[in-house]
Amino acid sequence: MAVKIRLKRLGKIRAPHYRIVVADSRTKRDGRVIEEIGLYHPTEEPSRIEVDSDRAQYWLGVGSQPTEQVLVLLKLTGDWGTFKGDKNAVSTVKVAGAKEAFVADEKKKPVLKPKAAKPAEAEAVIEAEEAAEVEVVAEAGDIADEAADGEKA
């Protein structure tokens, strides 16, 4: 079986990202794979390249052939040099720096109003409901008194 290490395309139109996979050379580009050994995101700045070096070395050792694109990625990560016996093979992949934490500008006013006004309104509604209950209880008491007076008469 002819085995190749190649890219499997994922993502939307004009926003591709790839998985580095080991697959039979006769399968479709995005078809069934034997193993996924890494990923490649070309649209990020800098491009994100991650390869499981142990698995890449294994598959290269058993005779799988990388495609041209994957060969370039393996050279960048240093895996191809390691496979060829270069003891000084080093990864030249640039690592993206950490993003800075977001800090709100205190000079600008917030777009949304604070929720402090809403609890006061809620308390007013609760007080109105309690007052309505007291009135209902008082009216019920008046009706009961009238009914009792009507029975006595």
UniProtKB/Swiss-Prot annotation:
InterPro entries: Ribosomal_bS16, Ribosomal_bS16_CS, Ribosomal_bS16_dom_sf. Transmembrane segments: none annotated. PROSITE patterns: RIBOSOMAL_S16 (PS00732). It comes from the Bacteria. GO terms for cellular component: cytoplasm; small ribosomal subunit. Keywords: Ribonucleoprotein, Ribosomal protein. One of its GO terms (biological process) is translation. GO terms for molecular function: structural constituent of ribosome. SUPFAM superfamilies: Ribosomal protein S16. Belongs to the bacterial ribosomal protein bS16 family. PANTHER family: 30S RIBOSOMAL PROTEIN S16 (PTHR12919), SMALL RIBOSOMAL SUBUNIT PROTEIN BS16M (PTHR12919:SF20). This is Small ribosomal subunit protein bS16. It comes from Leifsonia xyli subsp. xyli (strain CTCB07). The gene is rpsP.
